[in-house]
Amino acid sequence: INDMAKGRFRLGVGTGWLEIEHDLYGIPFPDLKTRFEMLEESLIYIREALSGNDKGFQGKYYQLEQFPVEPAALQDIPIIIGGGGKVKTPTLAGKYSDEFNIYAGPKEILSNSISLFKEVAVEDGRDVSKLEITTACPPVVGLTQDRVGESLTAAAKALSQSEDEIANTWKEKSYLYGTPDEVAATLSMWQEVGIEAVYLQLLSLQEDNRNETIEVIKQAVELI
């Protein structure tokens, strides 16, 4: 995939969180502590495999016999570690990731997690300037207040929550919400704490809604 994408492929690795999804596929879903242990062990192996180590791997959870990892990637494949954990997630990201995708949240939480991520990276001898910090959230936005209201109604329906619940949660967690002016304030805060890019988790794939969301973001960026 990385070769076909001309080096644009990025590998996102995580603990898993949606238990029902694991149940449906018959995949074990151990407790969070165990899942984090499994994640770290898998990251150690993945790093070695991607760097050309064909000696196999022997760990507590994973045992892989010696085999060549072929075809080899044309270049390094960036690893993304993301989530909203305040300690373990930024710690693992600082050790192993090329991109820390911290889930959107209040400024203080973002700032603390990003600081820990950088501290761990430096302690591990990594060049922080070469590591990326991104975020992700589902936008509830519109070019006008009326359009924001329509987006809010659609989000409430998609997520099976009330409009008040959506509005309160989005504002409380500093997700992208509102008109371009309001969105610009959130983007400015993200920029201030060190976030460089955002992945938009679109709740509607209808072309008009998608295009309006993109236009809101464009106008917001111009206001910063």
Predicted regions located by residue number:
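Active-site-adjacent structural elements that line small-molecule/cofactor binding pockets in enzymes
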Residues: 2-224
